[in-house]
Amino acid sequence: MTFRTLDTADLAGKRALVRVDFNVPVDGGKVADDTRLKAALPTIRFLADKGAKVVLLAHFDRPKGKVVPEMSLAFVAEPLAALLGAPVAFVGDCVGPAAAEVVNGLADGGVALLENVRFHAGEEKNDAEFAKALAANGDVYVNDAFSAAHRAHASTEGLAKLLPAYPGVSMQRELEALDAALGNPKKPVIGIVGGSKVSTKLDLLNNLVAKLDRLAIGGGMANTFLFAQGHDVGGSLCEKDLADTAREIMEKAKAAGCELLLPVDVVVAKKVAPGVETAVRSLSEVQADDLILDAGPESAKRLLAAMDQSLTLIWNGPLGVFEVPPFDEATVSAAKHAASLAKSGKIVAVAGGGDTVAALNHAGVSADFTFVSTAGGAFLEWMEGKTLPGVAALES
């Protein structure tokens, strides 16, 4: 894939319409986690420094094409301005005369945040007329919201057809990192896929076993594979109806030469709660009332050794119920090991997905990974090998 890059664009005095992801967690009407605001800063600063008028487009929540006052983006302007160290004008609509007046009145290098694009039904329908109304406030289009790139909406896809289109700084970093992890990786490549259910990650598993040298499966989804192999998983989370599917994935991996790493021992308890009594069991020792809540120490040791033999790691999903210690041990040990390998340049380590980001933050190692994607659904679809409309629309 080839893209125009912002450093080649003539930006002075131009209105740059920038699609960002400000769909942030909220607590008591305030931004509870400003990660996504911070992710937009490099692009905003780059454009402002080049003398562009920076016009931010974003969605928040699911107003379903109607104005829902409690889903207004107004609350984002103040924390964004504080992070930016510059004023941010908020506009109560994203199209029409009110938006045009503020945008056209911006000084070069000034920043405006327009109202929630999803207040208009045309956004999610990718309506051509709505895209034109958005485009009326811009001379160039910049997409810095990789996390919304799996949606063919007016502000993520339609706009890119109407104005010269560029990836933003964060978007470009994301595309380069994902290409290094899956598109054109240094081999051998190991994947870690965790989380609770196989059913939500079928496309992902089928795509990865065809591309990776090794794939470690953890979390609740590993129980489905263990059950498919004939092991008793006690009262653990397990999609028993997907046993045949799990066996098909195992066969596919074998045919493709992808080594599957499943737990060989597990950490169990009678309930999920902090400080409960736990035990490490081999697979043959799991009891009827056991809940498997983490991979065991031998499984973790094998995973670390497999990482040592790899040059690229791609990670989506935790290995256990990391939110409730001590069921975080396998996830934390794997995360710390991957981070130390990445920091010393021995491996390219790319991770993504909401639970994964939370797990790496919990382990305190996010900063040492080569790249951590906060994109969620878009990251998952990229890993599944799907075309992302918002990315495809930027191709030059």
From Swiss-Prot:
Keyword Cytoplasm carried by entry: yes
GO molecular function, one term: ATP binding
InterPro entries: Phosphoglycerate_kinase, Phosphoglycerate_kinase_N, Phosphoglycerate_kinase_sf
Gene: pgk
Subunit structure, interactors included: Monomer.
Pathway the protein takes part in: Carbohydrate degradation; glycolysis; pyruvate from D-glyceraldehyde 3-phosphate: step 2/5
Biological-process GO terms, alphabetical: gluconeogenesis; glycolytic process
Short name of any one Pfam family annotated for the protein: PGK
PANTHER family in the cross-refs: PHOSPHOGLYCERATE KINASE, PHOSPHOGLYCERATE KINASE 1, CHLOROPLASTIC-RELATED
Any single Gene Ontology cellular-component annotation: cytosol
E.C. number(s) listed in UniProt: 2.7.2.3
Protein name from the UniProt record: Phosphoglycerate kinase
Binding site for substrate: 21-23, 36, 59-62, 118, 151
Subcellular localization(s) per the UniProt record: Cytoplasm
Protein keywords: ATP-binding, Cytoplasm, Glycolysis, Kinase, Nucleotide-binding, Transferase
SUPFAM superfamilies named in the record: Phosphoglycerate kinase
The keyword Nucleotide-binding is assigned to this record: yes
Reaction equation(s) it catalyzes: (2R)-3-phosphoglycerate + ATP = (2R)-3-phospho-glyceroyl phosphate + ADP
Domain of life assignment: Bacteria
Predominant place of localization: cytoplasm
Residue numbers binding ATP: 201, 323, 353-356
Record family assignment: Belongs to the phosphoglycerate kinase family.
